[in-house]
Regions:
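Short Gly/Ser/Thr- and Asp/Glu-enriched loop/turn motifs at secondary-structure junctions
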Residues: 159-160, 202, 426-431, 471-475
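N-terminal entrance/gating region of PLP-dependent enzymes' catalytic architecture
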Residues: 2-160, 461, 465, 476, ...
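Active-site C-terminal subdomain of aminotransferase-like
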Residues: 314-419
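Conserved PLP-enzyme active-site core in the AAT-like
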Residues: 139, 172, 179-345
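Short loop-beta-helix segment that forms the pyridoxal 5′-phosphate
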Residues: 152-179, 232-234
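Conserved PLP-binding catalytic core of the aspartate aminotransferase-like
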Residues: 423-459
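PLP-dependent enzyme catalytic core of the Aspartate aminotransferase-like
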Residues: 472-528
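A short linear hydrophobic-aromatic micro-motif
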Residues: 161, 420-424, 464-469
Length: 528
């Protein structure tokens, strides 16, 4: 019996040894570089084939249809062979992916990317650099800091400014509200939230932002314990910018109630309209009432590098903090985003010294540990993508590309405005267009809501074009978001033709019979 147990143990040990040997053959290192190159060639073949044959931005598949493909996939049973795995990925992912580089992808703030940034992504992922501390990242630390400093020079926030890369605009806006909350609590009560938690009267803190600002401000308020009720939504003017009279009135009412103006969030490029709030005027109001001024330039930040449109961000230099998404108007892969603050001392709110990672002694010695200014610990080396793009493509060319899609938006506006059966409700400040199909029959708003929902879902189902949707004054609208330099006015004309085709098709049909089932079926599906 003892001998049998020994034999079993030896057998198990041998199996473990074989598995370990197999893992060694999969590790990225000099011994396996030839195998890695073979894998890269296989990936490139698949990419070339995919890009060459991709005609539409989307396959049109529904979630419940795609879900069926995953039935029977057993992740506990490896395929082992790279070619087999790539064929599976092609079927499960690439075949039904959404292609932002297609000229008729006009939906969300997703940009096609410069290929040089993909090369940088490959480098950063291959080395697997983590940038939270100097002893894990070396030169990567200084590349990120260089990108931060370069952006700060464009923002002109001053000598005490600093910043850090984040996962995206939502995290950057969360950091802004976190710093604003703690600054105000310390200012009015001498209270240190980091040590003591929130003061007893924290519900007096209020955040003022436009009704069309990004929803992440509400999310941040909830996460920070302030709640949605802490956010005061300020009406907008005819250009969908925060209305200054309404802002002043809202602040006055707040102060009369004994509340505290914690922060004012201005938007430089709203998601729907691309509208830019009057930053200089808002900065004056914020200064007068002692509020933290945050500028969400996740979308409009690309104006910083444009040859002819930098002036649209006048006043951003007055901000206490700024959000910029390079993965929008700088044509970088997701994610590539950063948060900036006028006074770097405020970043101490997110600093915690762990002896095993970033002890205080290292900071005192001048060691540049980036986790000292981030709410994240482990963090990817996203800055290399933009660094490499600046060194190979150049900031000016990236800026010209953004101006190109802005010009296209102006052309698109003129086209839509010339169509009698299309109602467009704003002129573009950046590269979005909000409009709706109205037909020629004087349909009610409720009917127009239904037809515009149908139009969007039909476009997606057929895969011919992808557009976005939004609501304005409780009415259903469609939206073009233009971020692709390859998109032409002809592409927009063709999409408008399809919009009108589906619109009239719906209006002419028996809504209760022929198209109601399809409409109801599609109603259950969200396309984002």
């Amino acid at each position: 019996m003892v001998q049998l147990n020994v034999l079993l143990a030896d057998s198990q040990q041998q199996a473990s040894t074989n598995e370990a040997s197999s893992m060694l053959n999969s590790m990225f290192n000099k011994e396996n570089i030839d195998n890695f190159k073979i894998g890269l060639e296989q990936v490139m073949q698949l990419l070339e084939q995919t890009i060459a044959t991709q005609q539409k931005p989307f396959s049109g598949i529904l979630p419940q249809e795609l879900a069926k493909k995953f039935i029977g996939i057993d992740l506990n049973q490896p395929l082992f062979d790279i070619q087999d795995a790539l064929e599976e990925v092609a079927q499960l992912y690439l075949k039904d992916a959404v292609y932002f580089n297609n000229p008729r992808y006009l939906a969300h703030l997703n940009c096609p990317i410069v290929y040089q940034s993909i090369l940088a992504e490959l480098l950063a992922t291959s080395i697997n650099t983590a940038v939270e501390t100097w002893d894990q990242s070396g030169g990567a630390t200084f590349i990120e800091q260089s990108i931060v400093d370069w952006t700060l020079s464009k923002l002109a926030l001053g000598e005490q400014a600093d910043g850090v890369f984040t996962s995206g605009g939502t995290q950057s806006n969360l950091m802004a509200m976190l710093l604003a909350r703690d600054f105000q609590c310390h200012l009015y009560a001498g209270h240190t939230n980091k040590q003591q938690g929130l003061p007893h009267d924290f519900r007096r803190l209020k955040i003022f932002t436009s009704k069309v600002s990004h929803f992440s401000i509400q999310k941040a308020a909830a996460i920070l314990g302030l709640g949605y009720d802490a956010v005061v939504s300020v009406p907008y003017d005819e250009y969908f910018r925060m209305d200054m009279t309404a802002l002043n009135q809202a602040i006055e009412h707040c102060q009369q109630q004994g509340d505290i103006v914690m922060a004012i969030v201005a938007t430089a490029g709203t998601t729907d309209f691309g509208s830019i709030d009057p930053l200089t005027q808002i900065a004056e109001i914020a200064k007068r009432c002692g509020a933290w001024l945050h500028v969400d330039a996740a979308y409009g930040g690309g104006l910083l590098i444009t040859p002819n449109n930098k002036h649209k961000l006048a006043g951003i230099e007055c901000a206490d903090s700024v959000t910029i998404d390079y993965h929008k108007s700088f044509f970088q892969p997701v994610s590539c985003s950063a948060f900036f603050v006028k006074d770097k001392q405020h970043l101490s709110v997110v600093t915690y010294h762990a002896e095993y990672l970033n002890p205080l002694s290292q900071q005192q010695a001048g060691t540049p540990d980036l986790c000292n200014k981030s709410i994240q610990t482990t963090r990817r080396f996203d800055a290399l993508k933009l660094w490499f793009s600046l060194r190979t493509v150049g900031a000016q060319n990236l800026g010209v590309a953004f101006e190109q899609v802005m010009h296209l938006a102006r052309q698109g506006y003129l086209l839509l405005a010339s169509e009698a059966d299309i109602e467009i409700i704003h002129q573009p400040q950046l590269s979005t267009l909000v409009f709706r199909f109205v037909g020629d029959s004087g349909a009610k708003d409720s009917e127009l809501d239904a037809v515009n929902k149908y139009i969007r879902k039909q476009l997606s189902r057929q895969g011919e074009a992808l557009i976005a949707a939004t609501k304005v004054a409780d009415k259903q609208y469609l939206k073009f978001t233009l971020l692709n330099c390859a998109t032409t006015i002809n592409d927009i004309q063709q999409v408008v033709r399809l919009i009108k085709q589906y619109g009239y098709q719906y209006l002419a049909s028996d809504l209760a019979n022929e198209h109601a089932p399809l409409s109801l079926a599609l109603e259950e599906v969200s396309y984002g």
